[in-house]
Every structure is written in C-alpha cells, then in structure tokens.
Amino acid sequence: MYEYINGLITNITPSYIVIASRSGVGYRLYSANPYRFEENVESHVYVQQIVRENDISLYGFIDADEKALFNKLLNVSGIGPKSALAILANGDAEGLISAVENDNVAYLTQFPGVGKKTAQQIVLDLKGKLDELASKTGMVDSSSNPEQSQALDDALEALLALGYTAKDVKAVAQIIGRNSDTTDGYIRSALKLLVK
C-alpha cells in the first residue's frame, strides 16, 4: 500500500496524471481534478491504491485531507472510486461537508452518478463523521498571515479535540478569525462564545 509518491509530473490528462518517481517508474494516478497539478514540476502526491477483482488502480490527491475524504466516501454504500472522484472534482470540500451535516440531499444529487437514494445514503453514513476534516478542508478562511493562520488552525483543532462539533467550531471560527491572536487567545475567545 502506498501513502504518497514524490516525483515529476510528466503528463496530465482529463482523468489522470502520470508521475515519474525518482526510481524511474511512471505511475498513472486517477485524480478528481488533474489540472490542479503542474506538468514538469516535482510534486508530493498522496495516493490511495484500490484493488478490485481484475484491476489495481492508484488515485492521487493534492493533500492528505482530500485523500481522507475520498476514503470516507468509499465507505458509503453505492459509492465507488469513480463516483467519489466525481464528488471531489469541484474542489468544494466545505460545501460537501456542510451538505452532509445539514441533510442537503439536493446539493449532493448535483454530482454525476449520485441520485436521491445515494445522496440520502451519503448523509446517513457520513453525518457526524466528518468533524475532523471540517476545519482542515477550507471550512475556515485562511489568513494572509501564516503565523496567525497556523495559530487559528491549532486552536480549531484543539476545540474539536475538546469535543465541540465541526458546526460549532465553524461558527466561532468566522468570528474569532477576524482578529489576529495567539493559539491560546483564539481558544479563550472561542470558549467564551461556545459557553454562552
């Protein structure tokens, strides 16, 4: 099983990329949106290997969180790798997580191969199970200051670890993220809002 591959992106097509590893092997990695990668650039691509009866395929992801969301989708009855990639293709992880948490079946049915029954199954299987990914996939606006952004990310992870839901954390993140602060300061501000 592979976790990631470091190498040179040598080819980009509408459905996959080819990455040449340093050992000289070229891997075909199916991707939700291959054009997010740059051709002829050394890249660190997260990989998921799927073994089927007559097929072994590799799927490539821009980061570990996208890979984790892909794997969560694969656990839903009726969702295979191609459907999971189609769902991830628009790059709106925030919208996907929000739709699952808010039972928005209409949003989920907009994806190819996802009908009403499958959308309901996605909500049933994943609701409440995406909390860890919520703060990592863009549900919180990033600051232009990297130190402030890291402090905010650390604070939000701490709140999730304390048992607050992703929905609550997202709500307070929009408020506390407006000001520059330390991790401790963000946590204190968030707790004041959450305890009310």
Swiss-Prot record:
Pfam families: HHH_5, RuvA_C, RuvA_N. Its main location: cytoplasm. The keyword Hydrolase does not apply. InterPro entries: DNA_helicase_Holl-junc_RuvA_I, Hlx-hairpin-Hlx_DNA-bd_motif, NA-bd_OB-fold, RuvA, RuvA_2-like, RuvA_C, RuvA_C_sf. Signal peptide: none annotated. The keyword DNA damage applies. Gene3D superfamilies: 5' to 3' exonuclease, C-terminal subdomain, DNA helicase RuvA subunit, C-terminal domain, Nucleic acid-binding proteins. Residues 63-141 are annotated as: Domain II. GO terms for cellular component: cytoplasm; Holliday junction helicase complex; Holliday junction resolvase complex. It is found in: Cytoplasm. Residues 142-148 are annotated as: Flexible linker. Residues 148-196 are annotated as: Domain III. SMART domains: HhH1. Residues 1-62 are annotated as: Domain I. GO terms for biological process: DNA recombination; DNA repair. Homotetramer. Forms an RuvA(8)-RuvB(12)-Holliday junction (HJ) complex. HJ DNA is sandwiched between 2 RuvA tetramers; dsDNA enters through RuvA and exits via RuvB. An RuvB hexamer assembles on each DNA strand where it exits the tetramer. Each RuvB hexamer is contacted by two RuvA subunits (via domain III) on 2 adjacent RuvB subunits; this complex drives branch migration. In the full resolvosome a probable DNA-RuvA(4)-RuvB(12)-RuvC(2) complex forms which resolves the HJ. Belongs to the RuvA family. Has three domains with a flexible linker between the domains II and III and assumes an 'L' shape. Domain III is highly mobile and contacts RuvB. The RuvA-RuvB-RuvC complex processes Holliday junction (HJ) DNA during genetic recombination and DNA repair, while the RuvA-RuvB complex plays an important role in the rescue of blocked DNA replication forks via replication fork reversal (RFR). RuvA specifically binds to HJ cruciform DNA, conferring on it an open structure. The RuvB hexamer acts as an ATP-dependent pump, pulling dsDNA into and through the RuvAB complex. HJ branch migration allows RuvC to scan DNA until it finds its consensus sequence, where it cleaves and resolves the cruciform DNA. This is Holliday junction branch migration complex subunit RuvA. The gene is ruvA.
